[in-house]
Amino acid sequence: MCIRDRIIFIYFALYIIIGRVYDGFLMSMQRISEIIYSQSLAFAVCDGILYIIIWLLSKHLPNILPGLMAFCGQILLAAVWAYLANHWYFRTFPPCTTAVIYGRHSQMTKLIDEYGMNKKYDVKKTVSAAECIVHIEMLADMETVFLSGVHSHERNVILKYCIARGITVYVVPCIGDVIMSGANPMHMFHLPLLQVKRYMAQPEYLFLKRAMDIFFSLAALVIASPVMIVTAIAIKAEDGGPVLYKQVRLTKNARPFEIVKFRSMQPDAEKDGVARLSTGEKDDRITFVGRVIRKYRIDELPQLFNILEGSLSIVGPRPERPEIAAQYCEHLPEFELRLQAKAGLTGYAQVYGKYNTTPYDKLQMDLMYIAHPSLIEDMKIVLATVKILFKPESTEGVAEGQATAARLEMAAATDSENTVQGKRCIKGIS
């Protein structure tokens, strides 16, 4: 195989891998616009890698214009392919007859419509678990069942019925389910057992993860240094205030450290000492430069120094402020489980959730990551992070009525009794 053939093989292998990471081939799960975006981003990453390979082999910078023209053609091709493939898929595979079973209340039907999944799932029944148990034969004609907030006993009955009849089941998990997903199956005393224990990653994984942190942070600092210099000048020129913003956050085992970010708010944004989450575009504390750098996550770049220092990792649960973590612990005691792993610059919840995703859902996402430590998963999250950089909904503020720590009586941070209870929760794993 000649060098050209090897390069072509590497290009298409990368395209398939990155396209799968970005869900660029999931016709049944993504809107056409999302498919086009994912495919275009996969082409952009592969084209960039190809450009670097050609540069290294030829030892001079190649003309970028042909590459840009080819990329425009790739976007057009991706759009045509996404439309035709989507049209073919849903003509070939009609929507699954679906039942939504809920415990108290479920928004699953609304979410299916909101995310454009009604082409994939045709919801025929939306019933409570109690009613379903009494008339479980109603599920006989279903192809798919969603379970949301269903008690374990009722859920087991429904699961057994569905699995025996080849019905696909999607379960919205609780915290216990997520913890159990990382259990180690074994046998002892002639009995099948599931071993569940505190998160303890293998030493070789931790060593390789730390090596990856150092390599990626150094490389990113070199590549991003021009952007960081321009950002620092812009922040200083806008209001003359400090360029960097330091804030105490919590990492593994609730150890406090100072996180470093580019300042995106006014210098006196929290002069009263009370922690407040951003409300997004409506937050008048954010400066003009701040809106730009927050939109593209440029304000996060100085955290690369935290990664080099060892307080942060490239991938892990996002670090919270102690006072906000105390509020989470007060209302979500399971939050302390999230502090078993080192905090990260990006994470599972950041990639697959939104800024205003509920704390409970984010907690479950972080625990899913912690339950299955893997360098391959880390690499997938790093690649997927690139995808969300240009999606505005990933940086939305806290919506009205959202169940965040700020909404859960943020004023209680000044209440000594509540604050002590939250601190006890945090210290419980130290």
State where each predicted segment sits.
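Glycine-rich flexible loop motifs, especially short His-Gly-Gly/GGXG/HXGH segments used as catalytic or interaction
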Residues: 182-219, 243-247, 354-375
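Aromatic-rich membrane-interfacial microdomains
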Residues: 6, 13-97
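A hydrophobic, helix-centered structural microdomain
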Residues: 205-269, 306, 381-430
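A short, structured surface patch at a secondary-structure boundary
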Residues: 279-342, 381-385
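A solvent-exposed beta-alpha-beta segment
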Residues: 81-180
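Short, glycine-rich, amphipathic interfacial segments at transmembrane boundaries or analogous
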Residues: 176, 245-285, 346-364
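Short, small-residue-biased leader/transition segments that mark boundaries at the very start
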Residues: 1-3
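Membrane-cytosol interface motif
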Residues: 39-43, 95-111, 242-265
